[in-house]
Amino acid sequence: MIELWPAIDLIGSTSVRLTEGKYDSEEKMSRSAEESIAYYSQFECVNRIHIVDLIGAKAQHAREFDYIKSLRRLTTKDIEVGGGIRTKSQIMDYFAAGINYCIVGTKGIQDTDWLKEMAHTFPGRIYLSVDAYGEDIKVNGWEEDTELNLFSFVRRLSDIPLGGIIYTDIAKDGKMSGPNFELTGQLVKATTIPVIASGGIRHQQDIQRLASLNVHAAIIGKAAHQASFWEGLK
């Protein structure tokens, strides 16, 4: 069964969503992060909550640690955190604060030796966020090119004990237009590491189609704020 991970994106301790990762598209969500935690926690089908420090991702250093630590106390659900995590000490601080999983992006992509070290130190608790326009990987809050191909890069990770690869199609993110099923399915076939789909998910039909592609989990952004998404779920 595919897992459901609703997302909370933070700017200035406020729950927001971006479109295509563009910071000037910031949209404040109707629920605060605290309200979102309470809302998502009522659903048995929610396996964990996905929290991103958006300014941390852009600034290359975690900015919302204390606030995220306070959110951790509000739920018994697992929580994963990403955004600006670049050092082992940051990872250890999050784990000490009760965070279950850490997501690394730019640092892990630019330094695979470090990624391997972190994954072996914390097996199954480190997730790699791979964000791409088409097959072109982006870093530093989606603002910089890498000249890395999505599939070539992912194939190099096969011996690293990651919890999973979080794949976001930037062109789909925040648009509620459906995930990139084609590339997501190809990515699942290209690696033995669990693939988590993010970006564009609208409704349960999208979830079912991702499940048919053997996607491990789906991160739900804007759609998770709509009661209609959760109808029929417990």
From Swiss-Prot:
Subcellular location: Cytoplasm
Catalytic activity from the UniProt record: 1-(5-phospho-beta-D-ribosyl)-5-[(5-phospho-beta-D-ribosylamino)methylideneamino]imidazole-4-carboxamide = 5-[(5-phospho-1-deoxy-D-ribulos-1-ylimino)methylamino]-1-(5-phospho-beta-D-ribosyl)imidazole-4-carboxamide
Record has Signal as a keyword: no
GO MF annotation, one: 1-(5-phosphoribosyl)-5-[(5-phosphoribosylamino)methylideneamino]imidazole-4-carboxamide isomerase activity
Entry EC no(s): 5.3.1.16
GO cellular-component term (any): cytoplasm
Active-site residues from the entry: 9 (proton acceptor), 131 (proton donor)
Pathway linked to the protein: Amino-acid biosynthesis; L-histidine biosynthesis; L-histidine from 5-phospho-alpha-D-ribose 1-diphosphate: step 4/9
Principal subcellular localization: cytoplasm
Recorded family membership: Belongs to the HisA/HisF family.
Protein name, entry field: 1-(5-phosphoribosyl)-5-[(5-phosphoribosylamino)methylideneamino] imidazole-4-carboxamide isomerase
Gene: hisA
